[in-house]
Amino acid sequence: ESVLAQEWKDYEILLVDDGSTDHSPQICDDYVKDYDFISVIHKENGGLSEARNTGISHAKGEYVYFPDSDDWIEPDTFIALAEALESLEFDIISFNREFVKGEEDAIVSEPEVTQVFEGKDAFVQMLKHRYITGFANDKIYRKSLFTDHNIQFPIGKYYEDLGTNYKLFLVAKKVYATNQKYYHYLIDNPDSITQSWNEKKFRDMFGFYKEMFYSDFVCSQLNQEELHISQLYYVNGLIHILASLYKSKLDKEYIDITDEVKQELLKNSVSLSQMKDQPNKLKYVLYRLKVLKLAFSIQNVF
């Protein structure tokens, strides 16, 4: 509904019914009957990545966008980005998001700041946690980034954005970024992710962080300073994984992953001052003081 509410109408909507067992297939068919610019693809369940890849292969437009079905966008999203879209100048158009607990949560406006980056520089901004996130649903992509470079979302994996966005940035020529928050990301329970951890989720996240950090495709394009920034991003990700293992009390059950993450942290140890701008800097301090697990044990007690 939030896509249909857009003032800028030069788009098509592809609904991918990924083997839904509820009333979703019929709802999709009803939309197709009511709107001539909506089409539906019914397929067997293959997960989010396969659904996105299917959408890309059927899309007719110059750009593709992947909003999640339980989130929504501001009604002026496309019209606000129309100039950037219609110029056909940018390979990726990136905006910002607001984490909300319900539709009553309003987005807080900020003075608009826009930036234009070369693809590699946009990737570095993502590594710095500035201007650009690692998520896919707050970005509009030129379709040819996928088709011309044989890039797909990894099928059967969690955290598929983590394993895809860095490739897209590094083949992109020009990226438009705005700080404006057009995307509402719904969080029913802030702790729901940590409550639903399993071994595959830890493995997939750990695997993508390692892949990005050690990839020749990445390393060959970065200078020494940028490689160090990549290392800090990697360490920040490793600390997030280790902290999540401790918080969910799964570190002993998944001892192999816990040990591997610790080994990578030891191999890529950085100073506390170097981590000062990282989101998980406090957790890294606790890790270096050897009290990270204790901190979460105390938190769970109280």
Q: Where are the language model's segments positioned?
A:
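Short alpha-helix within the catalytic core of nucleotide-sugar-dependent glycosyltransferases
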Residues: 1, 25-29, 61, 74-86
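Short, acidic, metal-binding catalytic loop of nucleotide-sugar glycosyltransferases
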Residues: 1-10
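A conserved acidic beta->alpha catalytic loop
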Residues: 2, 17-26, 44
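Structural signature of beta-strand start/N-cap positions in the alpha/beta core
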Residues: 10-12, 36-39, 89-91, 174
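Glycine-rich, basic loop-to-helix element that forms the pyrophosphate-binding segment
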Residues: 43-59, 66-72
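Donor-binding/catalytic cores of nucleotide-activated saccharide
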Residues: 48, 69-178, 185-198
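Catalytic core of nucleotide-sugar-dependent glycosyltransferases
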Residues: 180-189, 195-221, 237-244, 248-269
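Membrane-interface aromatic/basic loop that binds lipid-linked glycans or pyrophosphate carriers
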Residues: 247-302
